[in-house]
UniProtKB/Swiss-Prot annotation:
Similarity section: Belongs to the potexviruses coat protein family.
Gene Ontology annotations for the cellular component aspect, listed alphabetically: helical viral capsid; ribonucleoprotein complex
Miscellaneous field: The N- and the C-terminus of this capsid protein may be exposed on the surface of the virus particle. The central core sequence may be important in maintaining correct tertiary structure of the capsid protein and/or play a role in interacting with the viral RNA.
Amino acid composition bias (Basic and acidic residues), ranges on this chain: 1-24, 32-54
Annotated segments matching region Disordered: 1-54
Name this polypeptide is given: Capsid protein
Lineage: Viruses, Riboviria, Orthornavirae, Kitrinoviricota, Alsuviricetes
Recorded superkingdom: Viruses
Organism listed in the record: Potato virus M (strain German) (PVM)
A GO molecular function held by the record: structural molecule activity
Cellular localisation: Virion
Keywords: Capsid protein, Helical capsid protein, Ribonucleoprotein, Virion
Main location: virion
Amino acid sequence: MGDSTKKAETAKDVGTSQEKREARPLPTAADFEGKDTSEDTDGRAADADGEMSLERRLDSLREFLRERRGAIRVTNPGLETGRPRLQLAENMRPDPTNPYNRPSIEALSRIKPIAISNNMATSEDMMRIYVNLEGLGVPTEHVQQVVIQAVLFCKDASSSVFLDPRGSFEWPRGAITADAVLAVLKKDAETLRRVCRLYAPVTWNHMLTHNAPPAEWAAMGFQYEDRFAPFDCFDYVENTAAVQPLEGLIRRPTPREKVAHNTHKDIALRGANRNQVFSSLNAEVTGGMNGPELTRDYVKSNRK
């Protein structure tokens, strides 16, 4: 009896559960549409983010390549000017009050070099010359032109203290005798040659520009290739204390020109100084004659 009752209850429960399962509604297409839409939205957002990231990278690459392109590439950089100043350690800092202070290269670089030559006219000498030429009637704006004409005149004639000039130096609507100008140069610069040395680079460029060597080059025994060398101040062409042309030297003197100039200079000086052997030029000493010719022995020179 009890077993049959249990079986009946069990069968009833099974039937009830089957009815419940059979009563549950089936899912429709609408149930899946919302889920698929959210998943598609997430996928499209991820794709869009990836595309934007790729575009940003491409834009960055484009800008990078644009910055690197160009027709100019600086090579062999060796910049020193404008570099950051070094900070020395405390025990290495200079003491300018001590005469045995060791200056550093950095300190030496701050002392600007000034080219000085005692063998040419100074700035004070030239100022005296300019003022005196103005006083003689040369317009201020033409004083340098007159001085350069005088220097070029000496290139052809001579810069000797014994030079007796001829002619005049001109400017627009005016002129002054060469005697007056050279007298001022000799007086205010002590010697005419000191002024000519100051303008030696200018004279050199003028000769090369006009192909105008010293007029007496052939008579002085120079060869055609060395025709620009025979002027008194040739050895000051490369002197940095002299007045420099605006663009610099057209070319430097050649070694051959230097040899030719120095050879002629040696001969000329020995000829001019033959009386220097006398301690006095009185007739009792000289006998009324010039001194002996000064000779130089070139036998020991290397001429092989």
